[in-house]
């Protein structure tokens, strides 16, 4: 089965559940994993992954981190005062990777 690839959010700042949902979906589709396969890889129920990719509330932080880790999505913590600097640096690194 071919999985339609989606792209990561253009802004690395996770401002909502929907932004994180888009990143998880992008990681899964770029790995050519179906939702069922990704749920197996992440060791979570399929419905949990469905809820995450839909941006639904109610998924525990532990499960969300488990899914993100299994799919290779990294989350970073930075003080709000450094948000724009960190955002800019991550975008620069991401853009440099696009040129390779």
Where are these regions (language model features)?
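Residue-level signal for the short linker/turn that defines the boundary of a DNA-recognition helix
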Residues: 22, 32-33, 59
């Amino acid at each position: 089965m071919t999985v339609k690839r989606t792209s990561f959010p253009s802004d690395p700042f996770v401002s909502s559940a929907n932004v994180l949902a888009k990143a998880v979906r992008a990681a899964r589709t770029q790995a050519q994993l179906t939702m069922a396969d990704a749920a197996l890889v992440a060791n979570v129920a399929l419905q949990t992954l469905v809820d995450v990719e839909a941006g639904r509330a109610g998924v525990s932080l532990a499960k969300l981190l488990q899914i993100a880790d299994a799919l290779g999505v990294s989350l970073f913590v930075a003080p709000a005062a450094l948000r724009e600097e960190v955002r800019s640096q991550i975008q620069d690194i991401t853009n440099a990777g696009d040129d390779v």
